[in-house]
């Protein structure tokens, strides 16, 4: 089983586009098949100030993982600790999950 860690923010337009275009449906299928599980971390930027309520509810863990991976933009996805370029789309994402599961 692969671990996916996704970084996002409630005011991030590209994050919403990613979710609606392929991420939500693809991850639901992979979770239901037992291929992956995922954790979502909310960063405090790009919105001015710290206004993302999901970030504020778990600031310590969100900030720790963001800094651990050096995440400096959102959307950002890690698969088994390796950065995944979200431009790879659903096919690239599924292939990365399957590759991670075969190791």
Regions inferred by a protein language model and the residue ranges of each:
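Extracytoplasmic/secreted cell-surface and envelope-processing proteins
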Residues: 14-16, 48-50, 86-89
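Local sequence-structure signature of Cys/Sec-based thiol-disulfide redox active-site neighborhoods
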Residues: 1-44
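Non-catalytic, surface beta->alpha helical segment in thiol-disulfide oxidoreductase systems
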Residues: 56-57, 64, 69-103
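Extended polysaccharide-engagement surfaces of secreted carbohydrate-active enzymes
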Residues: 25, 33, 38-66
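Generic structural motif recognizing short loop/turn segments at the entrances and edges of beta-strands
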Residues: 2-3, 34-39, 52, 73-75, ...
